[in-house]
């Protein structure tokens, strides 16, 4: 079958399904694609094609993820669904699939379960802004008890969302049956369309990366005789015009400079923007004053820090991680953007050790200041291999 041409004039939004194992995340993902396919807005998908998720690597970690795309009348969506619970944890912490919003799937027959809670907490920690809820499997109730049971589960879900800092009072909650919709039952197909209307209106369009303040991590530095020092790297966000000021942040005291040349693939440019691999010529900066691991950023938009709280996933032995637990004062390398910095780890009170496979909250103290902010992603490495992945949740100093 020919691939659909997606209409790029529609705003693009990244979403994903989250929730407890067997509550119907993958069935719902298939149902959304299948129902929208009837309007010519998606390719119909069956459960197996989504469940059989390909392996991906992000920050040295293997993750199984299914990506599907579809449209509504208003938007173009990229939707991520993970087969296993550990895949969700890894995916969200590494930022492999950024989510602008999530659809939380809760089986109305069970109500919220342990992973429901864990996924909501993870969504909060990694900065997913909005959650829409789908109460699944309502076809399992007898007609006369359905309304009451759905109402009870809805109350539980709202209080759980509020507990973790989401807007439990106003989050849209749609009840339905993903399986019945996937099988083509018109009554239940309506529920899927209602869900997508809620996603269209409640989940906000993300700010484009180009609208954010300029930031580029330095990968390499060299000197051009007679012209000066050039720093190269990939622009993470924002736009930089020729002759604008930037700050060199991290590892050393922050310095200001002016970008007097922007080069990409040996061509001179007037600006560099998010996604570009660029070389920036820095006025009055000596080769020794800028190094890999620093960032070039719009002045006063990012500051170097040495201490922060983070949520971290520690790889299992089978994933290439450590074979043994680690304890207080473990001092691995923290890999931010383009460089490793040694840091010490402290646990939350009451925890003695961290075992491979754990998802844990830690306090980290780096030996050198690095340009970081809430939401910055990092890997934890030991002897050059990745043993964990994390996301900064709170800056301490």
Swiss-Prot record:
Family: Belongs to the TRAFAC class translation factor GTPase superfamily. Classic translation factor GTPase family. EF-Tu/EF-1A subfamily.
Protein name (Swiss-Prot/TrEMBL): Elongation factor Tu
Positions with a binding annotation for GTP: 19-26, 81-85, 136-139
Upper taxonomic lineage: Bacteria, Bacillati, Mycoplasmatota, Mycoplasmoidales, Metamycoplasmataceae
Protein residues bound to Mg(2+): 26
Function: GTP hydrolase that promotes the GTP-dependent binding of aminoacyl-tRNA to the A-site of ribosomes during protein biosynthesis.
Reaction catalysed by this enzyme: GTP + H2O = GDP + phosphate + H(+)
Keyword Iron-sulfur: no
Enzyme Commission number(s) from the entry: 3.6.5.3
Subcellular location: Cytoplasm
UniProt GO molecular function: GTP binding; GTPase activity; translation elongation factor activity
Keywords linked to the UniProt accession: Cytoplasm, Elongation factor, GTP-binding, Hydrolase, Magnesium, Metal-binding, Nucleotide-binding, Protein biosynthesis
Domain of life of the source: Bacteria
Annotated region (G3), positions in chain: 81-84
Domain tr-type G residue range list: 10-207
One cellular component term from this protein's GO annotations in UniProt: cytosol
Region spans: G2: 60-64
Ranges for region G5: 177-179
Xref: InterPro entries: EF-Tu_GTP-bd, EF-Tu_GTPase, EFTu-like_2, EFTU_2, G_TR_CS, P-loop_NTPase, Small_GTP-bd, T_Tr_GTP-bd_dom
Assembly and binders: Monomer.
Keyword Hydrolase: yes
Segments for region (G4): 136-139
Region (G1): 19-26
Top-level EC class: hydrolase
């Amino acid at each position: 079958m020919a691939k659909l041409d997606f209409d790029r004039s529609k705003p693009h939004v990244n979403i994903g399904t989250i929730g407890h194992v067997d509550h119907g995340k993958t069935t719902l993902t298939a149902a959304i694609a299948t129902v929208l396919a009837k309007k010519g807005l998606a390719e119909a998908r069956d459960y197996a094609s989504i469940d059989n998720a390909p392996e991906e690597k992000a920050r040295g970690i293997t993750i199984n993820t299914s990506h599907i795309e579809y449209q509504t009348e208003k938007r173009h969506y990229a939707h991520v669904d993970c087969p296993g619970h550990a895949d969700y944890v890894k995916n969200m912490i590494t930022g492999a699939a950024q989510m602008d919003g999530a659809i939380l799937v809760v089986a109305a027959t069970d109500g919220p379960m342990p992973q429901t809670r864990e996924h909501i907490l993870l969504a909060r920690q990694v900065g997913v802004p909005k959650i829409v809820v789908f109460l699944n499997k309502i076809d399992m109730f007898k007609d006369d008890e359905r309304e009451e049971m759905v109402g009870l589960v809805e109350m539980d879900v709202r209080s759980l969302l509020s507990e973790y800092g989401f807007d439990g009072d106003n989050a849209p909650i749609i009840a339905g049956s993903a399986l019945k919709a996937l099988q083509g039952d018109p009554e239940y197909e309506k529920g899927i369309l209602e869900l997508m209307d809620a996603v269209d209106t409640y989940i906000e369009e993300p700010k484009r990366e180009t609208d954010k303040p300029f930031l580029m991590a330095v990968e390499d530095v060299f000197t051009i005789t007679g012209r000066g020092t050039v720093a190269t790297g990939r622009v993470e966000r924002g736009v930089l015009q020729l002759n604008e000021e930037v700050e060199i942040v991290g590892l050393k005291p922050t310095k200001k400079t002016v970008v007097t040349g922007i080069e990409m693939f040996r061509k001179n440019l007037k600006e560099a923007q998010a996604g570009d691999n660029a070389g920036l010529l820095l006025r009055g900066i000596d080769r020794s004053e800028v190094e890999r691991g620093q960032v070039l950023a719009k002045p006063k938009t990012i500051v170097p820090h040495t201490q922060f709280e983070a949520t971290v996933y520690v790889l299992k032995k089978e994933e290439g991680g450590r074979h043994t637990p680690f304890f207080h004062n473990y001092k691995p390398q923290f890999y931010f953007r383009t460089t490793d910095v040694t840091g010490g780890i402290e646990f939350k009170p009451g925890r003695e050790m961290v075992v491979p496979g754990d998802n844990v909250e830690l306090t980290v103290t780096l030996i050198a200041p690095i340009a970081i902010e809430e939401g910055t992603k990092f890997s934890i490495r030991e002897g050059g291999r990745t043993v964990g992945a994390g996301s900064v949740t709170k800056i301490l100093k």
